[in-house]
């Protein structure tokens, strides 16, 4: 009996008697479609992932970003739950001590090759943008944007020098994060770049040669994923990214922490309670804080 079933299975495979299985498999996939005119040169560089996410991502206001500048990174870290892993360390800051806060304008670069270069030229011509994506940002960045560039990390390549940075700065961008390098370090440390920090992995005199292949699409910075429109908070230690839908939660949490810590400092100055009862607050002191609010 087993031999007969085995022979039938072989016969079915040879004759296509199991065609229904192939039909079922094919039905899993949606039919592909031709891209409409202008699709490849959409100004926001179409990303299927972002097409799913964007409807739920709120607009971020300049006032919210201004509020966020005063929130310590540790407080943000405590408020974002599962997004705590989105911190990338190991960056140098061209403006030591200056904080970087804004919305991510992402771009991804790859080492050059002739066919990739031809494709980049075609898209740049059709879309009427500069194929050098840092130059494109110098024409398209909006106030409050942070250019976030994936450029191969410590083994990668340079994004720009002081002229490219000046163009981006003049658009009102808040700064730049480069998972890679830059040139003109001395120039970028000049006073004219006060308020425009560039977080980077290294600097050397090479000019830019890598090709921009993604603009306003998901990128990898260090070991974390960054999406266009993410909130960027950077300092001398590193840079943190989180989705804009969490921004209001972060600001509300920060206000709560500020009130609690002011209360704790007052208790410490009064010297009426033990430190262990103040930090963290004992239940009775938590109730007192609640009554004061």
What is the predicted role of each segment?
Residues 2-10:
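Sec-dependent signal peptide recognition
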Residues 19-23:
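Boundary at the C-terminal end of the N-terminal hydrophobic targeting segment
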Residues 52-127:
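N-terminal low-complexity or amphipathic/hydrophobic leaders
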Residues 167-206:
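Ligand/cofactor pocket segment of small-molecule handling proteins
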Residues 201-279:
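Acidic, glycine-rich flexible loop/linker segments
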